Amino acid sequence: MPAKAQAAGKKGSKKAKAPKPSGDKKRRRKRKESYGIYIYKVLKQVHPDTGISSRAMSIMNSFVNDVFERIAAEASRLAHYNKKSTITSREVQTAVRLLLPGELAKHAVSEGTKAVTKYTTSK
């Protein structure tokens, strides 16, 4: 553990970089994926005059990731129990019913069904 704390203290240390070959392109930073734009769109639908801080957005993003992982894990478990190798909308719907309480599950299932219907009709 002390080695990690020591390494964190050497943030500003600079090493000489090897010269790049002339054909190399500048490397791009990996993009951080987030649900931020979708959270913002929903916020504007519900409360058009309300904003959101970057900290609140980060918390909401973590929440969405957590719920997604829980639903995916439960759907995977259900598929495994039924000796299926594919997670279908049926497993996802059952996972949502198991994970979310009462009225929230009903709303989530109806919104999910609506989204799947919209997707299949657009194809």
Swiss-Prot record:
One of its GO terms (molecular function) is protein heterodimerization activity. Signal peptide: none annotated. Pfam families: Histone. Residues 1-32 are annotated as: Disordered. InterPro entries: Histone-fold (IPR009072), Histone_H2A/H2B/H3 (IPR007125), Histone_H2B (IPR000558), HISTONE_H2B_site (IPR055333). It is found in: Nucleus; Chromosome. Monoubiquitination of Lys-118 gives a specific tag for epigenetic transcriptional activation and is also prerequisite for histone H3 'Lys-4' and 'Lys-79' methylation. Disulfide bonds: none annotated. Keywords: Chromosome, DNA-binding, Glycoprotein, Isopeptide bond, Nucleosome core, Nucleus, Ubl conjugation. The nucleosome is a histone octamer containing two molecules each of H2A, H2B, H3 and H4 assembled in one H3-H4 heterotetramer and two H2A-H2B heterodimers. The octamer wraps approximately 147 bp of DNA. Core component of nucleosome. Nucleosomes wrap and compact DNA into chromatin, limiting DNA accessibility to the cellular machineries which require DNA as a template. Histones thereby play a central role in transcription regulation, DNA repair, DNA replication and chromosomal stability. DNA accessibility is regulated via a complex set of post-translational modifications of histones, also called histone code, and nucleosome remodeling. PANTHER family: HISTONE H2B. This is Late histone H2B.L3. It comes from Strongylocentrotus purpuratus (Purple sea urchin).
